[in-house]
């Protein structure tokens, strides 16, 4: 069996009246318990990770699922999830979906996920946020790297 750093993926979409997000689809691998918990949930604007991502209008990352606004923190930690990254998708100004990537690392596997950003008018893109788990050298390198336009 192959073990990957990304353990689960969810796609949340607005309800017909656009007041909440509902789970459209998800891939949970062997995380049946977490899938069952997730299937019945909905998130209002600015609620939980999908809702907060909707409100922020840009990707968000949680590196501690148990001590945050993450609604399924205890369940996530029970199945070995260590971080979550939410990415909004827009059509014009309207939210089309929020993708949530769940990651998990342990003593035998190392992985990282990064969010990069270049502020308007800034020619350099730099690390905005990242979860590196045990990849300390990689984290140091990422935090001290910038990319010019069309480079990297």
Describe every region a protein language model picked out.
Residues 2-13, 109-124:
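Short N-terminal helix-loop-first-beta-strand/juxtamembrane motif that initiates sensory/input modules
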Residues 82-90:
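A short, aliphatic-rich beta-strand micro-motif
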Residues 17-71, 123-152:
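Regulatory sensory and allosteric helical modules in signal-transduction proteins
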Residues 90-95, 107:
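Flexible loop/coil segments at beta-strand boundaries within sensory signal-transduction domains
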Residues 41-44, 75-81:
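Short loop/turn motifs at secondary-structure junctions and domain boundaries
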Residues 57, 93, 116-119:
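Interdomain signal-transducing alpha-helices
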Residues 8, 86, 98:
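Short hydrophobic/aromatic beta-strand element in the GNAT-like acyltransferase core
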Residues 98-106:
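Short beta-strand-to-loop transition segments that serve as allosteric relay/switch motifs
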